Amino acid sequence: MIQSQTYLNVADNSGARKIMCIRVLGGSQRQYATIGDVIIAVVKDSVPNMALKRSEVVRAVVVRTRKGLRRDNGMTIRFDDNAAVVINKEGNPRGTRVFGPVARELRDRNFTKIVSLAPEVL
């Protein structure tokens, strides 16, 4: 579960290393984001000489969470870290590569470009 002030690793090569969630999109009173949800975040750590700089406000989709995600078949999937992929207004990733595994639920949320770039889909 991702909420405001949560730090996330960035799982792509957009130039950001760490982001901090400042808003969960999808309703006025929405508190938590899970895998596949879009958040608004601020870049807290970045790679030098890249497109994204510190203190830049970006949109991102959550691809991994430490909190378990329960599937319809009863299986629970849980990752080692909280991670997100930076996206643009249309929902396409800003980077050209995605690092680490992503959940299959992203395909249901129409983030097929992120799923196709990922090395492993769980």
Swiss-Prot record:
Single GO biological process annotation from the record: translation
Subunit-level organization: Part of the 50S ribosomal subunit.
Molecular function GO labels: large ribosomal subunit rRNA binding; structural constituent of ribosome
Identification of the protein by name: Large ribosomal subunit protein uL14c
Function: Binds to 23S rRNA.
Lineage of source species: Eukaryota, Viridiplantae, Streptophyta, Chlorokybophyceae, Chlorokybales
Origin superkingdom: Eukaryota
Annotated family: Belongs to the universal ribosomal protein uL14 family.
PROSITE patterns found in the cross-reference section: RIBOSOMAL_L14
InterPro entries, per database record: Ribosomal_uL14 (IPR000218), Ribosomal_uL14_bac-type (IPR005745), Ribosomal_uL14_CS (IPR019972), Ribosomal_uL14_sf (IPR036853)
The organism of origin for this protein: Chlorokybus atmophyticus
Ranges that cross the membrane: none
UniProt KW keywords: Chloroplast, Plastid, Ribonucleoprotein, Ribosomal protein, RNA-binding, rRNA-binding
Cell compartments where the protein resides: Plastid, Chloroplast
One Pfam family cited in the UniProt record for this chain: Ribosomal_L14
GO cellular component annotations of the record: chloroplast; cytosolic large ribosomal subunit
Major localization class: plastid
